[in-house]
Amino acid sequence: MKLRSVLLAGLFGASTAASGQMLSPDGYGKIRFGQQLGAVERQLGQRAAPRTADPACSMVTFKRYPDVRFMVENGVITRADANRIVRNSAGITARMSVKEAQRHRPALLVGPHKYDENGQYLTLAQGTDKALIFEASKGKLQRMRAGLKPAVEYVETCG
C-alpha cells in the first residue's frame, strides 16, 4: 500500500510540476528569453536535444519541459513554441474561441493566417520587443508561441 501511495504521489507531483509552468513573453518555466543556451543547460542540469545543427537557428527541447520547443539563434534562446494552448500569462485557455479570447484580452491584435484561409494570428505584444502569439483556425485556438521580436513573429520555425 505504501509503495502505491509513493508511486501515485510521484506521478501526480510530476504532472503538477509540468502543468504548473507558464508561457509568457518573458519565458517558460525557469527559461528566460535572451539567455544563452549553455547557461540554461547548466541551470536546468540537462542538455538540450538535439544538439544545435545550425548555429544560426535551431529548435531544441528539454526533458523538463516536454510541451514546448525552444528556438535558439546564435546560441541565445529567443522563442518557445507549443503545439497546443498551454498555461499562459494572458490567461487564455484552449476552451476559448477567438471571440472569447478577444473579450478576455481586448489588447489582442487579430490578423490573417499566412497559410490557412480560415486561420488567424492573435498577438498580445509586451512593449516593443516581446509578444505572445496564438494561432487559430475556424475560430478555435490551435497552438501558441512566445518570445522576443523578431523571432516570435516568424511564421516558420527553424532547424
State the predicted function of each range.
Residues 20-21, 35-76, 94-141, 146-151:
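A cross-family detector of function-defining hotspots
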Residues 157-159:
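Short, solvent-exposed mixed-charge patches
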Residues 1-7:
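Bacterial N-terminal signal peptides that target proteins for export
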